[in-house]
Amino acid sequence: IVADGGQVVLYAPHIRDISSTHPAVEQIGYHCRDYFVKQWDRFKNFHWGDLAHCTHLRGAGTYDEVDGERDRVTVTLATGITEDRTRAINLDYLDPRHVDPTAWAADPDTLVVPDAGEDLYRLR
């Protein structure tokens, strides 16, 4: 549940790898669907499963050659993955040492989902 222009922070300081199932993510990065569709010649040789995975995290957005990629939400990792690697895959970075889930949970404008795992939803 994230408003347009909002932010999702994935807080998991124990995570050190981007994807063992989809190693191509480190070459491709996470983007909206239009980013791939409108640059198909650049991405046509990647496995479609990898491309699909790279759109699932980012979600809705648009892409054109003039304005570039414009995503509905910002996705930020607060993990054990380095800042350089996080930014290289087109995600924002937050040092997990600066995250206080208890303080965030006390903020009425912030939704904290403990142990969210793979249970991410978008309401219409």
Where do the language-model regions lie?
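C-terminal catalytic subdomain
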Residues: I1-T76
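Extended hydrophobic packing segments that form well-structured cores
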Residues: D67-R124
